[in-house]
Amino acid sequence: MGIKIIANNKKAYHDYFIDEVLEAGMVLLGTEVKSLRLGKANLKDAFCRIMGGELYVNNLHISPYEFGNRENADPTRARKLLVHRAELDKLARKVDEKGLSLVPTKLYFKEGRVKIEIGIARGKKLHDKRQTLKSKEADREMARALRDRH
């Protein structure tokens, strides 16, 4: 079956340095899965938080399923993520020690199951964002020059 990407969080790569990523499963309702199969998700303002010894993703917007009924849930509700206890403990240590954040970077189907990729992230300063944009623009200019030359 492979991997089918539902949504990417491009803003996360703009606002953060992503040091490490890990994959987690999600606890969802049936109508949410149906909506995700239609590609109706937005990771833009999403973030992860450890509450009560469990990992949750907040502000992940999954649009209500249009053919659903009263079972449709709140589009931005907190959803539990499924990770191994050792991974959760490691994440908790890193977030507490170094002031890092947990940011969802990608939402996808893997062998029929919804997975979310979580990045351990450090915030970028304004000058870091500008530097990233300059380097991307320089790479684009070089690629354009090479393409035009041949």
UniProtKB/Swiss-Prot annotation:
Xref: Pfam families: SmpB
Keywords: Cytoplasm, RNA-binding
Coiled-coil stretches noted in the UniProt entry, renumbered to this chain: none
Domain of life: Bacteria
Annotated compartments: Cytoplasm
PROSITE patterns (alphabetical): SSRP (PS01317)
Segments for region (Disordered): 129-150
Gene Ontology biological-process annotations: trans-translation
InterPro entries: SmpB, SsrA-bd_prot, SsrA-bd_prot_CS
GO cellular component, one term: cytosol
GO molecular function: RNA binding
Family statement drawn from the similarity comment of this UniProt entry: Belongs to the SmpB family.
Protein purpose: Required for rescue of stalled ribosomes mediated by trans-translation. Binds to transfer-messenger RNA (tmRNA), required for stable association of tmRNA with ribosomes. tmRNA and SmpB together mimic tRNA shape, replacing the anticodon stem-loop with SmpB. tmRNA is encoded by the ssrA gene; the 2 termini fold to resemble tRNA(Ala) and it encodes a 'tag peptide', a short internal open reading frame. During trans-translation Ala-aminoacylated tmRNA acts like a tRNA, entering the A-site of stalled ribosomes, displacing the stalled mRNA.
Protein name in the entry: SsrA-binding protein
Organism annotation: Syntrophotalea carbinolica (strain DSM 2380 / NBRC 103641 / GraBd1)
Biological classification of the source: Bacteria, Pseudomonadati, Thermodesulfobacteriota, Desulfuromonadia, Desulfuromonadales
Gene designation per UniProt: smpB
